[in-house]
């Protein structure tokens, strides 16, 4: 309950995005934008032409979505969600 790791994991979906890109255009512009903004790549979905990223602290997720949607080749930007099974 007071576990720092648990607290960190429960808050993480609020600062993670899944970004899909057009495979024919590639992901170079997206990768440069991710690096420029100080984001962390959590997973690279090669079969789906997408990446899961963690935003740096202090960057509003809605502003990040708008930013990444403008990057050349990006097709979709979604908030990452975690669901608990009951």
Outline where the language-model segments fall.
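Hydrophobic beta-strand residues in large extracellular and virion-surface proteins
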Residues: 17-19, 34, 39-41, 53
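Short, surface-exposed ligand-recognition loops at beta-strand->loop->(often short) alpha-helix junctions
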Residues: 17-28, 57
């Amino acid at each position: 309950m007071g576990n720092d790791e648990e607290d960190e994991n429960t808050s993480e979906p609020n600062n993670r995005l899944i970004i899909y890109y057009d495979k024919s255009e590639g992901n170079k512009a997206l990768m440069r934008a991710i690096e420029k903004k100080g984001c962390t790549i959590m997973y690279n979905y090669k079969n789906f032409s997408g990446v899961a990223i963690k935003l740096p602290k202090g960057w509003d997720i809605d502003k990040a979505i708008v930013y990444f949607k403008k990057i050349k080749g990006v097709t979709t930007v979604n908030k990452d969600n975690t669901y608990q099974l009951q």
